[in-house]
């Protein structure tokens, strides 16, 4: 399977109805922290940062006191869906992470992309992967 095509064509694409608006960075990462595919702009993350994300999916609320860290950037964790979606905010941008059976789908955005648009793009691909048993 060509995971890079999913990142390029389904995550880093123009937002529907908003030509030129797209995520800042995106990736698909295995539960073990291995990168399956990523945009050129996706931050280099530390293993402990990915461990924190996985722990929060298994123990919702784990990241709330400390924030979500990715590539040295700290995001304030905002409402998500326990065990399924983590959302974070930093200034005028943020992050959405959708958990599938085998992977995590990451989307990072800055204005003019809205949190809702990022959620839609990331969760749509995540839901598709779940339907495919991935």
Curated annotation (Swiss-Prot):
Q: Which Gene3D superfamilies match?
A: Dynein light chain 2a, cytoplasmic
Q: Which UniProt keywords apply?
A: Actin-binding, Allergen, Cytoplasm, Cytoskeleton, Disulfide bond, Phosphoprotein
Matching SUPFAM superfamilies: Profilin (actin-binding protein)
Q: How is it modified after translation?
A: Phosphorylated by MAP kinases.
Recorded GO cellular component terms are: cell cortex; cytoskeleton
In terms of one coarse class, where is the protein primarily found?
A: cytoplasm
The compartments listed are: Cytoplasm, Cytoskeleton
Q: Which GO terms describe its molecular function?
A: actin monomer binding
Q: Involved in PIP2 interaction: where is this motif?
A: 84-100
Which SMART domains does its entry note? PROF
Q: What else is known?
A: The variability of the residues taking part of IgE-binding epitopes might be responsible of the difference in cross-reactivity among olive pollen cultivars, and between distantly related pollen species, leading to a variable range of allergy reactions among atopic patients.
Q: How does it assemble?
A: Occurs in many kinds of cells as a complex with monomeric actin in a 1:1 ratio.
User: Which purpose does this protein serve, as stated in its record?
Assistant: Binds to actin and affects the structure of the cytoskeleton. At high concentrations, profilin prevents the polymerization of actin, whereas it enhances it at low concentrations.
The protein's name in its UniProt record = Profilin-2
């Amino acid at each position: 399977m060509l995971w890079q095509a999913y990142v390029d064509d389904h995550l880093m694409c123009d937002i529907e109805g908003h030509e030129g608006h797209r995520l800042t960075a995106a990736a698909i990462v295995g539960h073990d922290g291995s990168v399956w595919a990523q945009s050129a702009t996706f931050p280099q993350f530390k293993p402990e940062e990915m461990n924190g994300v996985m722990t929060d999916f298994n123990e919702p609320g784990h990241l709330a006191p400390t924030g979500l860290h990715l590539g040295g950037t700290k995001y304030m964790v905002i409402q998500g869906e326990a065990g399924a979606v983590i959302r974070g905010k930093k200034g005028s941008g943020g992050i959405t992470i959708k958990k599938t059976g085998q992977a995590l789908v990451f989307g990072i955005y800055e204005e003019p992309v809205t949190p809702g648009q990022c959620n839609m793009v990331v969760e749509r691909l995540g839901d598709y992967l779940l339907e495919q048993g991935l």
